[in-house]
Amino acid sequence: ILGHVDVVPCSGNWICDPFKPEIIDGKLYGRGVLDDKGPLLACLHAVKILKAMGLPLQKRIRFIVGANEETDWKCMDYYFNQKKIPAPQMSFTPDAVFPLIYAEKGVFQYQLVTDITEELVLSGGNAFNAVADHASVLLPEEMEAVIRKNLLSWETQTNCHFRLDRMDSSLRLTAEGVAAHAAHPSTGINAISGLMKAVSELPLQNELSRIAAFYMKYIGFDLTGKGLGIDLSDEISGKLSFNVGKVEVQDYKVIFSIDNRVPVTYRCMQVQELIQKHLSGSGFRFENPNATESIHIPKDSFLVQALLESYRTVVGDSSAMPLVDGACSYARALDNCVAFGAL
């Protein structure tokens, strides 16, 4: 049983301490209570109950707890490749939904980068694999009237909340969205997209206006990568998903950090080639790719059928079928592993 105890970075919008679990109205709040600390503890208690019942087991049950699942999985590399610990014959990770996930899309993360020649204060989001729930930019103070005139319209168009603050000799425009996992970007509201929409409508003639124009042409609010020519799909896993998780300025470079979930019949290199082709002449370049290819365990395999039958029997839902998801779980770390629960 594979689980993880690391978490995605926290935004500043928590109403309680995210690292001090708190029960409110019968629900447990804290970073990672669902992903994946709670499910991992549930599995530990389940095995403890089996042990207390004295049930005979034909196989040994092993728990593997990682702390690098949300980033680059160095924990799995260390455990299996450096320490040379034998992999289990079959496994599940309680890091998704019931009844189970038999196929996971590929995860392709990369950056779109452009050089700038002037000072620019622009930032937003926290990580590749989360929908950005905040983004802000500094603007000249002479823009105040036109910004205030358009605030309500921008909120209506983008579903973001906008705030304008006076600084010493400039204005800070902030967009607030709704965070979500990059595997399901439609469940969130991307503040970076909202901010770029607003900036693109301002009468600016500078690097910022160029960047906003690029964003709206090649990305915008589309969640399938159509503007970059990567709106791919297949019968097994559906459409590619596209998320802008972060924007930052470093060393006179503007960097957008992107996360794609790639249909299982495509390879990440195919996506890269399409993006590079479409970026030609845009002023932006493709950098720092990191690919985790898809997995697909056959529906008729013993592992899938055993877990599926267990779920159907316990829950009483004989019509439940295995699912495909864009999330990336530890199921990819092993040859015969699926995500099973815990939601």
Per-region residue spans from a language model:
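A common structural junction motif
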Residues: 6, 85, 151-161, 202-206, ...
